[in-house]
A protein has these predicted regions:
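Short coil-to-beta-strand transition motifs
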Residues: 50-59
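Hydrophobic faces of well-ordered beta-strands that scaffold small-molecule active sites
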Residues: 14-16, 31-35, 87
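Single conserved hydrophobic/aromatic residue that forms the stacking wall/gate
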Residues: 1-13
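C-terminal accessory subdomain/extension
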Residues: 65-179
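Glycine-rich phosphate-binding active-site loops on the catalytic face of alpha/beta enzymes
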Residues: 35-46
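Catalytic cores of alpha/beta
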Residues: 19-28
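Conserved, mostly hydrophobic/aromatic
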Residues: 18, 36, 60, 112, ...
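Catalytic metal-binding/acid-base residues of hydrolase active sites
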Residues: 20, 38, 94
Length: 179
């Protein structure tokens, strides 16, 4: 009978907390809670109770030196103001990387450092600026994960983490771990 109360002649379960409520109001959890986005390791209030459970990462395919004043990507939208090292990574809008993140609006992490997206996000690939990052072809690029929360992307897109997560295409390989 845990979680069940008799109200009049009917039984009811009391539940008033979503993920944020679980974190903020432990005394108001009553009979059960609705973890929601917390199942994906996302905390709406940036608390240390919930830990990240997902990472989206890829590897650097190619790195090229590009002179200042040159352009990168479709429609020449990536205009370089300085000589740059530009890396291509195999993820694009067909994989769920939103095109609005391109043109310097967001970044991924390469060896723990911010690598801004350069030019438009293409269908299968995008370019990142690794000029100030010690890296090589084959190194990882973290789109979101422990050190780059998915909320950084959702905030840049003026949306919610659910939309970012559900936009990841089925063509992206999933690897599941169990402790």
């Amino acid at each position: 009978e845990i979680g069940v109360r008799l109200v009049g002649s009917e039984m009811c379960i009391r539940d008033s907390c979503n993920t944020a409520g679980i974190e903020r109001f432990p005394g108001a959890q009553f009979d059960m809670v609705r973890l929601g986005i917390g199942l994906y390791g996302v905390s709406p209030i940036d608390n240390s109770i919930i830990h990240n459970v997902s990472t989206l990462k890829t590897t650097i395919l190619q790195i090229r030196d590009v002179p200042a004043e040159d352009t990168v990507g479709y429609s020449r939208k990536g205009h370089l103001e300085r000589p740059s090292r530009i890396a291509a990574i195999p993820i694009g809008y067909a994989d769920g990387l939103n095109r609005h993140l391109g043109r310097g609006n967001a970044y991924c992490l390469v060896n723990g450092k911010k690598a801004p997206y350069v030019g438009n996000i293409c269908m299968d690939v995008c370019m990142i600026d690794v000029t100030d990052i010690d890296c090589r072809e084959g190194d990882q690029a973290i789109i979101f994960g422990d050190d780059l929360p998915i909320t950084v992307l959702s905030d840049k897109l003026d949306t919610i983490p659910y939309e970012v997560l559900t936009s990841i295409s089925t063509r992206v390989k999933r690897v599941y771990y169990q402790d």
